[in-house]
Amino acid sequence: AGTSPNNVTPGFYYWDGAKWVRLQTGAGTNNSWLTTGNTGTNASTNFLGTIDNIDLVFKRNNTQSGLLNEFRTSFGYNSLNPASTGVGLVAMGVSSLSANTTGSYLTAIGNDALNKNTTGSQNTAIGTAAMFNNTIGEYNFALGNDALKQNTSGSFNVGIGVAALTSNTLGNRNIAIGNDALKSSTNKSYNIGIGESALKNNTVGEYNIAVGSNSMENNSGSRNNVLGTFSLRNNTSGSDNTAIGYEVLYSNTTGYSNFAGGYHSLFSNTIGGGNIGIGYEALTLNTTGNSNVALGYESLKNNTTAYSNIGIGFQTLFSTTTGGGNIALGAEALKTNTVGRDNIALGLNTLTKNINGNYNFAAGFNALLNNTASNNIAIGYVSQTANTAGYSNISLGFQTLMANTTGYNNTSIGYQSLLNNTTG
């Protein structure tokens, strides 16, 4: 109002007890917040909120879309059930925590995160539909779209990555890190899958550890330990296997209790069990052979069905396919053996060219190097090194029976004993 009786600004007025005050209808200088925006605000004094202990609620189409409460915070259409009594709640995203009743200490960030949660507590879900169906599960952590999406009552799970542990419903204490890790597991527990598609199709296996992309991707076995990309990728029900390296035990399906370490070691093994392959392509072609030990570069590389062989050293028993019960210790010992069985070769190049000879014993550099026959014993430097078809010979000592080729039933003991015997 002006100073004269008729000097009045048009508008609506109210009596504040001392004077008439005009109601502001547009941008003005009072403390009203305008729906068209405000000017002249001061961040240190102006705010949108309350100055008493009353909640601040945001709504859209009369549906709660935000809440500032002493124990609960939410923002997003239909986020956080208004009837929720839980404490320590954070819901950010459309329909996040929309069904929660008494669940407490929950963090849901992303559309539909923890959407069905009712009484479950101590869960963290970050990502669209992360832990969407969880109702009573507790102490879970999900990071990534659809991570732990189907979980209902499973607890103490960690799912990090798109669709990590997405099918889990009842399983407990699983860890999945990587897109699609442990994707198909529903009710199994104590599995660890780290890497994209690690343990992806596991449904019944438990107590497995898979580290590496696609490691144990098709597994349903239990108590397997894998470190390496594509290792044990096709394992179905095989259990108690350990695979370390790229594509180790790649083809294994039902084989059990195998230990393989090194590029492509036991690569082709399918149902063979109780094998140990350590080294580059050790036992790489083994399919059904059991109880073999290969330690060294390409040791027992071509073994397929043979069993109970031991090869230690560079290319030991390299060519063996079906021969079993052999022991080779030393570089290229029994290298070309294929079907020969129950041979023992100790030393560099011992019995290297043996193919089908059986029951031979060679100890010493180049001992029985060229042998293909059976039932020979050669101990000493180049002992019986030229022998090819001779059988049932015994030689003990330096260069004993060194030149023998086809001679048989000989016994040679001592330095260069029967050195030049060839066919006798």
Task: Label every model-predicted segment.
Residues 2, 44-424:
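Glycine- and small/polar-enriched repetitive beta-structure motifs of secreted/surface proteins
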Residues 2-26, 54-63:
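Short, surface-exposed terminal/edge motifs of secreted or surface/virion proteins that either
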Residues 18-21, 26, 39, 196, ...:
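A generic structural signal for solvent-exposed, polar alpha-helical segments
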